[in-house]
């Protein structure tokens, strides 16, 4: 799992943000951020593998998350506020069991909350950052994170079709078919790409220019991945009663 977390951090440019943290605090901070991400992944795994969720089990996962946040110096009240978007993400996942699909929501809204774990990491790093050296805030990463989350859905489409997962691309394929699903994802990718360019078009800030450059790179990578995986699905259509849809069809 540590390797998976390190790959996530690399992909989301977490090492770049950590470079603005005082060197003496960096190793300790990274260790605890990895543990926090592990705690969240364990919660996520429970949500993806168990249809009937138990409050006591959920409480156990949240106790681990809060314990790690305590090690990072946050009070229970601060931890509750920091993790509000993780709880919203959990709500979206649990609502699948009530047939409340994420396709009913704005794609920007849904993917924003889906990026809760990475935004939590950014918020914590920000609290340890020398603000005199770094001139961006968390909101500057918005479109980078939105495109990255779409990339994650497309990348994981084959494994997510057999789990209880709120992969929006997978859900759209089941609801409207592959061609329309691909079209909708491509459209929203373009919207996020254009919004990112509009936000930074006139900036001369080096940190923001980096974010714009990375967002652009990830946009083109994701468009290509969408083309590639859509072709693979076209050649071998999904089982319409696998994973999430197995439970929905028998519920």
Which residues does each predicted region cover?
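Active-site/pore-lining binding-face segments in mid-to-C-terminal subdomains
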Residues: 135-209
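Post-signal peptide N-terminal segment of secreted/secretory-pathway proteins
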Residues: 21-23
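C-terminal structured domains
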Residues: 165, 171, 194-198, 202, ...
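All-alpha helical catalytic cores of prenyl diphosphate-utilizing isoprenoid enzymes
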Residues: 1-16, 26-33, 37-39, 54-161, ...
């Amino acid at each position: 799992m540590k390797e998976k977390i390190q790959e996530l951090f690399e992909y989301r440019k977490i090492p770049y943000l950590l470079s603005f943290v005082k060197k003496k605090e960096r190793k300790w901070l990274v260790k605890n951020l990895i543990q926090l991400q592990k705690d969240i992944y364990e919660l996520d795994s429970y949500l993806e593998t168990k249809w009937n969720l138990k409050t006591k089990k959920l409480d156990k996962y949240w106790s681990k998350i809060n314990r790690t946040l305590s090690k990072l110096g946050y009070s229970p009240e601060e931890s509750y506020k920091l993790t509000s978007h993780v709880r919203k993400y959990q709500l979206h996942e649990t609502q699948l069991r009530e047939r409340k699909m994420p396709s009913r929501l704005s794609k920007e809204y849904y993917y924003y909350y889906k990026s809760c774990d990475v935004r939590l990491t950014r918020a914590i790093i920000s609290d340890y950052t020398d603000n005199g050296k770094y001139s961006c805030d968390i909101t500057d990463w918005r479109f980078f994170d939105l495109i990255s989350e779409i990339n994650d859905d497309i990348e994981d489409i084959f494994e997510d079709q057999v789990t209880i997962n709120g992969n929006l691309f997978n859900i759209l394929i089941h609801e409207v078919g592959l061609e329309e699903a691909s079209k909708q994802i491509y459209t929203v990718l373009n919207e996020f790409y254009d919004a990112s360019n509009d936000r930074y078009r006139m900036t001369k800030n080096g940190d923001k220019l980096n974010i714009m450059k990375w967002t652009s790179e990830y946009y083109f990578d994701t468009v290509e991945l969408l083309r590639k995986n859509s072709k693979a699905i076209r050649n071998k259509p999904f089982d319409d009663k696998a994973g999430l849809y197995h439970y929905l069809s028998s519920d």
